[in-house]
Amino acid sequence: MRLYVGVHLKITKRFFIILICFVFALCLIIQTGCNSDDSITPITIRFWHTYTGKQRDIFAMLVDTYNTTEGKSRNVFVVAEYKTQEEITNYLETAFSSQASSVEYPEITFISKESAYKANMHNLVVNAEKYLSKQELKGYFDGFMKEGQIAGTDETFVFPISKTSSVTIINDSMWRQFYVDENVKLKQWETWSGINSLAEKYYQWSNGRALIAFESVEDFIFTYSAQQLPPLVQTGNKEIRINTNKETLRGIWDFYYSGVINGYILQTDNVLESLEQGKIVAYLGEPHDMTFFPKKYINFNGENSTFLITSALYPTINDSRKVYPQKGNGVSVFNHGEEINQASYDFLHWLCSNENVIQFSVANNEISSFQPIYEKKSTEQFFKQLSVFNYKKHQILSNSLHQVTEGKTYSPTGFVEYDSFCEEITHSLIDISSKALSEVHGYEKEGFTHQQAVKMVDTEDRFKIWYENVLAIANKY
């Protein structure tokens, strides 16, 4: 009996030892598995952006969504860092100058056209065509993509997320008074010749007031050149050309210079103030929220009246070539190796094709770059709600969207000292027109009629002076 008990105890003891070893081994296996998962460091993508306000909040929400869904499954984590455009440009320009190998670049950053061109010269950025499929790229608006093709090829180094497309913003209260009396049509706003005809009639009807102002004369110059062809800045065959076609420049001159000296176009740095004071009926410029516009304006009797707003498409030369302006910096992906580059473009495509990107772009009155988004039912429903709760914003955005989807949009690609080139070209036209207008006022004080004074400065010699100035500027770059 004792022997039996002893054997039984030995077997029981051995069983417990085996059981403990088994449990311990199982724990080790589980722990090893956990450690294995934890040891996989996620790919971190730093994204330097410039978004503010509501758009910044929505962007943060989109990034969080990605990190907890698609990014998590791909083991990718996006870190959004806010910086001003000036901070980004200064950092990049300093880095380009130093050419130090120790410089750290973000994986993705908002970037100016000029900085992007320089980054590409240093082989620091990678193009979208290498990492996104043809089918994926096909969905992006052509004009948005072409602006980022800074090497004179079909390779996109500045990737678009969203952009604005300028329209014509009209003081509907003043416009209604004018068109009732003069039997003019809203459709006349859609062409340069139509606006010129409106401006001439309005000048007489209003006793010498300007019809329009430009929020950006630069946008007018480059858009008009693209409408007429050839554009002032043209890419292709691995080069960037500055075209100084005399006929194209003549068209720009005839509308702007003649418009200013005749009193049809108001030169101003503050279109909002000009609207509020009743100095203009409309301006050509970027869409804005309704909070941007005045609630009252000074009417023809010098009294405060309610400011009502309507909008029209940005003017074109004719219906056969509808080219409209676009504006807004894109992003560049800096080279950090194939895996990170691919992850960066995967995130960008996810962002642009996510249905919530519509709320993000509309927050800043922009058009999202990925066209299929606008075919989604959720987008249709969003715009229906917008038309109910903010009809005027809906109308302005609808005009912008129409320009992008039904026409073509254009903004020149960048190059070294691109910003300086644009500034010089723009101010050359503004300055010569401003000086001529001062001469007109001087002649009027001397007793000449307005028509006589205009005729004295509206000469072929003036155009030749400007044309030679443009040639000199172009030859510098």
Segments (PLM) and residue ranges:
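Short, low-complexity disordered leader/linker segments with a strong preference
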Residues: 1-45, 461, 465-477
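Short, solvent-exposed loop/beta-turn-alpha elements that line the ligand-binding surface or hinge
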Residues: 129-140, 185-187, 230-251, 299-303, ...
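Early extracytoplasmic/lumenal segment of secretory-pathway proteins
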Residues: 42-46, 50-116, 273
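Extracytoplasmic/periplasmic substrate-recognition and gating elements
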Residues: 300-372
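Glycine-centered hinge/linker elements that transmit conformational signals in sensory
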Residues: 196-202, 235-269, 309-310, 314
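Conserved C-terminal helix/tail region of periplasmic/extracytoplasmic solute-binding proteins
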Residues: 398-477
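Extracytoplasmic/periplasmic solute-binding protein
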Residues: 151-161, 166-168, 176, 193-241
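Hinge/lid segment of periplasmic solute-binding proteins
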Residues: 109-167, 306-315
